[in-house]
């Protein structure tokens, strides 16, 4: 088994940090649904401003708010206005990489989804596992995307 990215929020802005809350990251559930991130799912967080890297779990905030709030100890690593990357992962076999289609959301000001991308692993002419990033923003209704199944 290998650990791979399953969903990613790339360039989302931290809207708050609550040191006194008991852990987690609070995210807009509409954003999570577009990417395929579930409540209580563990995610990795990488702070582009400071370089800090942490792991915590997701809880849902107000739908449509664009919220991205670090809670508890995580609040020490990310402050309001920091730009972060949030990645969900899963364990899978290399052969399943051909069917796994992770969604990556990029953001504009106010944490509005700018683009919807998809990672694609395919058999190339020179190697068994090749890689490309596809922009599916115009090809699919990003707001109507169903969460990505974690298990087959």
From Swiss-Prot:
Active site location: 24, 57
**UniProt: substrate binding residues:** 56, 72-74
Q: Which cofactor does it need?
A: pyruvate
**Which EC numbers characterise this protein's activity in its record?**
4.1.1.11
Keyword Acetylation part of the UniProt annotation: no
Q: Which reaction does it catalyse?
A: L-aspartate + H(+) = beta-alanine + CO2
Co-factor: note: Binds 1 pyruvoyl group covalently per subunit.
Query: Would you say which domain of life the source belongs to?
Result: Bacteria
Q: Which cysteines are joined by disulfide bonds?
A: none
Posttranslational mods:
Is synthesized initially as an inactive proenzyme, which is activated by self-cleavage at a specific serine bond to produce a beta-subunit with a hydroxyl group at its C-terminus and an alpha-subunit with a pyruvoyl group at its N-terminus.
By its UniProt entry, which Pfam families does this protein fall under? Asp_decarbox (PF02261)
Give the keywords, sorted: Autocatalytic cleavage, Cytoplasm, Decarboxylase, Lyase, Pantothenate biosynthesis, Pyruvate, Schiff base, Zymogen
Which PANTHER family does this entry report, sorted A to Z?
ASPARTATE 1-DECARBOXYLASE (PTHR21012:SF0)
Tell me which NCBIfam families the record gives: panD (TIGR00223)
Q: What protein name applies here?
A: Aspartate 1-decarboxylase
